[in-house]
């Protein structure tokens, strides 16, 4: 029997019935369940629901076969961070607002979950960013983007960028986003970056509020090594990986490249990225 770990976030009470229906369907199938501690607290305290589980988890155990993430895109990114290099397949169940990264909506999940249990699904791989600081720390990973941002609100920072050790430009801006195809519909998009189809092997460099009008988003192959060095009046800057923030001194440079592993996303039904754009981003809609 496949073992499933469930991660989630606190939800609105009207979604409680759908959440319980999904977990009960897994219980009825005899699925060994491991539930994240904070999410289990929500189930027990807010929904008065006490599922039969094999264990309470804070991090993802190695023996898990599948991961179910119940939440929005923020919860999905947090779960992807938990999965790390293990490449355990993850199913996203949307209980948030947009749910661009998730596969199914909460109200339909209990009907579709038998496909997961029967092995009737496909796997879609998503590329990740590997981010290494030159201070000797271990690499970190991001599904959507790595953002270099100013720490103080009053002045810009300068981000010097090199591609494969070839100098590109100095970005005088509020920051610079390096996004994967998955992240091209997130922070990068708000900076007028292009939307990149998930199967494309590219990264996009998108400046945030650049000082110069001729600093535009740039698409590069994902086998490019991107080195970033920062100059700032505050002597520090922010490194943000999928919403996880660290403060670094300006003498710390960053190397970004494609990670050697991918994120494996479970698809319970045929998936069309074009349909997702139309449905969730109102792509091409005549809004008047």
Curated annotation (Swiss-Prot):
GO terms for molecular function: ATP binding; metal ion binding; NAD binding; NAD+ kinase activity. Keywords: ATP-binding, Cytoplasm, Kinase, NAD, NADP, Nucleotide-binding, Transferase. It is an enzyme of class 2 (transferase). The keyword Cell membrane does not apply. The keyword Repressor does not apply. GO terms for cellular component: cytoplasm. GO terms for biological process: NAD metabolic process; NADP biosynthetic process. The active site is at 73 (proton acceptor). It is found in: Cytoplasm. NAD(+) binds at residues 73-74, 78, 144-145, 174, 185-190, 209. Involved in the regulation of the intracellular balance of NAD and NADP, and is a key enzyme in the biosynthesis of NADP. Catalyzes specifically the phosphorylation on 2'-hydroxyl of the adenosine moiety of NAD to yield NADP. PANTHER family: NAD KINASE. Belongs to the NAD kinase family. NCBIfam families: PRK01911.1. This is NAD kinase. It comes from Porphyromonas gingivalis (strain ATCC 33277 / DSM 20709 / CIP 103683 / JCM 12257 / NCTC 11834 / 2561). The lineage of its organism: Bacteria, Pseudomonadati, Bacteroidota, Bacteroidia, Bacteroidales. The gene is nadK.
